[in-house]
Amino acid sequence: MDLVLLEKALLGLFAAAVLAVAVAKLTGKRYRLPPGPAGAPVVGNWLQVGDDLNHRNLMSLAKRFGDIFLLRMGVRNLVVVSTPELAKEVLHTQGVEFGSRTRNVVFDIFTGKGQDMVFTVYGDHWRKMRRIMTVPFFTNKVVAQNRVGWEEEARLVVEDVRKDPRAAAEGVVIRRRLQLMMYNDMFRIMFDTRFESEQDPLFNKLKALNAERSRLSQSFEYNYGDFIPVLRPFLRGYLNRCHDLKTRRMKVFEDNFVQERKKVMAQTGEIRCAMDHILEAERKGEINHDNVLYIVENINVAAIETTLWSIEWGIAELVNHPAIQSKLREEMDSVLGAGVPVTEPDLERLPYLQAIVKETLRLRMAIPLLVPHMNLNDGKLAGYDIPAESKILVNAWFLANDPKRWVRPDEFRPERFLEEEKTVEAHGNDFRFVPFGVGRRSCPGIILALPIIGITLGRLVQNFQLLPPPGQDKIDTTEKPGQFSNQIAKHATIVCKPLEA
């Protein structure tokens, strides 16, 4: 470490602490802030609570400090809400006031300081991007046009697993094949293209670039430079890696996909996929070319991996609950007929399959804190003052796993959505269960995720008995929480024993 730089940073910290205290006493606005642990000057609560602000740690803090509490993370205020009533206030009632997204040094790089849709502030740019993305990505028409492709990709997964001699014996890490399926599901929508196999060089390049992007943005390593700007020089190497990765990813998107669609459109004049719609919006001057690339960035980050995590969690729970797996198979055989593959239109006739999807999203929520919200101006919440540009976290996982609000929430029990919770849906009609958020900044990808998860789990259970590897009673479902995610820590080996056709 550069000792001169460290000395300057420490002196800067001391000076900032003295100045902050003096300014606060002389001119500071008096706020009635939410409760929370007392913090130290400059660093606030950072050294007390550490970097790992995952959903379970925040649940523990809520039990100590209440339904709404404040953490001071350096110069940033972080407000956490943990009840359905407060979630409704943030996401719906005051959806405009708390409808922006927080900014940090890493996401500013990956989104061009908010030129995308998912991570931009609430305003005209967000409204424009949401409108432009909705028609080609997030409508019932899109589902109707693409569902045959999703069903085909699920069929190919089943075929490939059947062909693999390891699958029925020692088992396979089925996630790897499902990852190819998810890329194909989304790249069919985006670019009217697909990858032929897991060995496809372009697929592997994309997969590696997206994985590195997730690692860099999900890591807690950069928090100190984000929380305490005077320490940001120590992040120089980290931020340079982010810039380099962004450049390489954007070049792959541009050279291999966007330009290819431009060539096809020039030849045919037809609009066949989402990117054609997006490029038409660029041609009309509604967005610029950077916006086009950031839309591709959003879909790669916000649609592919998150849905894959949910499928992986669903498989893990079905393996560990063979009676539930058998009950699902019986439902499909009874409703569809033995050997009849489940399709997207069938899902509404399969309530137990729908309940399994919802129970997976409840217990193993992929984005347990949702995407953080922010208020651009001073606001009020539960009678407390919320200073402008506070980061607002809704602990959606805790809302869906609070024993005060759910019967035996730590159990994987799909029957709850057919019995005491039969009116609860994933789109947020009950603020105890908001896996995709609610309101203006909710995730529009719900319209794609639910059928893809349902088709995939249904096809696998129709064709295989899903089992743990030899010598194991269950597979490990330890969580690996990130800043914005909840993944399974170890990608499990699954024995896929073919069923009689």
Swiss-Prot record:
It catalyses: (E)-cinnamate + reduced [NADPH--hemoprotein reductase] + O2 = (E)-4-coumarate + oxidized [NADPH--hemoprotein reductase] + H2O + H(+). Catalyzes the first oxidative step of the phenylpropanoid pathway in higher plants by transforming trans-cinnamate into p-coumarate. The compounds formed by this pathway are essential components for lignification, pollination, and defense against ultraviolet light, predators and pathogens. Can also use 2-naphthoic acid as substrate. It is found in: Membrane. Its cofactor is heme. (E)-cinnamate binds at residues 213-218, 302. Pathway: Phenylpropanoid metabolism; trans-4-coumarate biosynthesis; trans-4-coumarate from trans-cinnamate: step 1/1. GO terms for cellular component: membrane. SUPFAM superfamilies: Cytochrome P450. This is Trans-cinnamate 4-monooxygenase. The keyword Transmembrane helix applies. The keyword Transmembrane applies. The chain crosses the membrane at residues 3-23. GO terms for biological process: lignin metabolic process. It is a single-pass membrane protein. Its EC number is 1.14.14.91. Heme binds at residue 443. GO terms for molecular function: heme binding; iron ion binding; trans-cinnamate 4-monooxygenase activity. It comes from the Eukaryota. Keywords: Heme, Iron, Membrane, Metal-binding, Monooxygenase, Oxidoreductase, Transmembrane, Transmembrane helix. Gene3D superfamilies: Cytochrome P450. Belongs to the cytochrome P450 family.
